[in-house]
């Protein structure tokens, strides 16, 4: 599981994904959490995560079903990982509340200010996955989309972050 982005200026942290993961743990389902520096670009983080995932798979050969879950920006990390990960029929990459459309100019002033102050200008963003969106990812991909009006961030955008299609991706 890979968490989303929680910048310092957010007053409260939204834990909508915590309860489902608590359930997995209570059911004795192996659950691994990956912590990363959310000030780094998702495409950069995905390189390290890919190596960690390969290590986990190799050291746990008895696990036959891997559900990789990324929430929000963590979902972007998951998609960049899937972009470069070798085919493995044991893996499903899941993205939860992850945009498939990003229009930086239409994001809030706070987001743009944060990006400027921390020089977080990633050369690759969600729009860098156009090839995968058009042709599909190598491994299975499932999208768990929030309703925009209930999502703590997306409801503030004046564009639809889900206005995009990923070939062969399952959408819930």
Q: What are the residue ranges of the model-derived segments?
A:
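Active-site loop/turn elements of alpha/beta-hydrolase fold enzymes
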Residues: 4, 34-38, 98, 146
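Serine-dependent carboxylesterase/thioesterase catalytic core
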Residues: 2-4, 11-15, 43-139
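C-terminal catalytic-base region of ester-bond hydrolases, centering on the histidine
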Residues: 127-172
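Hydrophobic/aromatic beta-strand patches that form the interior of the parallel beta-sheet core
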Residues: 32, 94, 142-145
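Short, intrinsically disordered, charge-balanced linker/junction segments flanking boundaries
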Residues: 1, 6, 169-171
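Conserved alpha/beta-hydrolase
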Residues: 22-40
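Serine-esterase "nucleophile elbow" of acetyl-processing enzymes
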Residues: 9-27
């Amino acid at each position: 599981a890979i968490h989303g982005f929680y910048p310092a200026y957010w007053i409260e942290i939204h834990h909508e994904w915590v309860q489902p993961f608590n359930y997995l743990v209570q059911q004795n389902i192996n659950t691994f959490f990956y912590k990363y520096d959310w000030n780094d670009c998702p495409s950069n983080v995905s390189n390290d995560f890919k190596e960690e995932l390969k290590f986990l798979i190799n050291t746990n050969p008895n696990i036959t079903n891997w559900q990789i879950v990324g929430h929000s920006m963590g979902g972007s990390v998951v998609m960049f990982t899937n972009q470069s990960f070798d085919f493995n029929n044991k893996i499903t990459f899941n993205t939860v509340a992850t945009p498939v459309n990003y229009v930086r100019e239409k994001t809030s002033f706070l987001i743009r200010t944060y990006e400027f102050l921390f020089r977080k200008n990633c050369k690759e963003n969600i729009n860098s996955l156009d090839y995968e969106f058009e042709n599909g990812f190598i491994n299975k991909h499932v999208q768990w989309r929030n309703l925009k009006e209930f999502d703590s961030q997306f409801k503030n955008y004046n564009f639809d972050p889900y206005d995009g299609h990923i070939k062969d991706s399952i959408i819930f």
